[in-house]
């Protein structure tokens, strides 16, 4: 098993035992990739329960209206199926890129309990997300192009996620020909250029205030 822990996370007492006990229910199920549980955020007054389901993809959990943070435990064999891409000149790709691929094939066993606690730091990943867009735009362009392919159904969503893709290509200084060639849809790319320009200006402004 592989337990995803950030630098500002702390394992709650009894977590390893809970993981081992829950693992008994998933190790022989080839359609389960691991365990999803709750994460306790210390500097928040409330926390949400996960949906009352036995199993789900990570994406579908958030589609139910859940907005909390999660603790993820993966079967190591599943993670090996989905390696992170190597991008010249960049050293970061959001884990969401891999998680979305896993969601296309597997589900998580839901454990409606806390496995870790966290107090978000001012210099942490979540707080400084805007600066990551500027530092690693090629990786983010890959993420948004893939997210578009998997989840953009309505025209509004297509323009939104294509706009994000275009803005990241602009930060990466990717030539127009390559941007359109790698795009999930050339037509939607063309009509999403205004959205791309808007996101480009917003991310640049947000990063400059950090």
Feature-to-residue mapping (PLM):
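Structural register within alpha-helical repeat arrays
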Residues: 162-165
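Catalytic core of nucleotide-sugar-dependent glycosyltransferases
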Residues: 116-121, 128-153
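Short beta-strand-to-loop acidic/aromatic patch adjacent to the donor-nucleotide binding site
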Residues: 1-10
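Membrane-interface aromatic/basic loop that binds lipid-linked glycans or pyrophosphate carriers
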Residues: 169-210
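Conserved donor NDP-sugar-binding/catalytic core segment of glycosyltransferases
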Residues: 13-47
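Conserved nucleotide-sugar donor-binding catalytic segment
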Residues: 41, 45-127
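Alpha-helical elements of Rossmann-like donor-binding domains used by nucleotide-donor carbohydrate transfer enzymes
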Residues: 14, 18-21, 97, 101, ...
């Amino acid at each position: 098993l592989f337990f995803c822990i950030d630098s500002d996370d702390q394992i709650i007492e009894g977590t390893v035992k809970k993981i081992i006990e829950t693992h008994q229910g998933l190790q022989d199920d080839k359609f389960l990739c691991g365990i999803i549980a709750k994460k306790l955020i210390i500097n928040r007054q409330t926390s949400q329960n996960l949906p009352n389901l036995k199993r789900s993809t990570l994406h579908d959990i958030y589609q139910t209206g859940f907005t909390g943070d999660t603790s993820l435990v993966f079967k190591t064999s599943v993670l090996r199926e989905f390696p992170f891409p190597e991008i010249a000149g960049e050293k970061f790709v959001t884990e969401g890129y891999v998680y979305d691929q896993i969601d296309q094939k597997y589900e998580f066993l839901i454990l409606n309990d806390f496995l870790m606690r966290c107090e978000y730091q001012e210099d942490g990943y979540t707080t400084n997300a805007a600066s990551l867009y500027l530092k690693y735009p090629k990786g983010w362009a890959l993420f948004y192009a893939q997210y578009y392919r998997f989840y953009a159904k309505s025209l509004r969503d297509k323009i939104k996620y294509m706009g994000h893709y275009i803005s990241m290509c602009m930060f990466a200084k990717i030539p127009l020909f390559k941007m359109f060639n790698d795009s999930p849809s050339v037509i939607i790319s063309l009509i999403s250029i205004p959205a791309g320009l808007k996101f480009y200006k917003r991310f640049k402004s947000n990063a400059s205030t950090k």
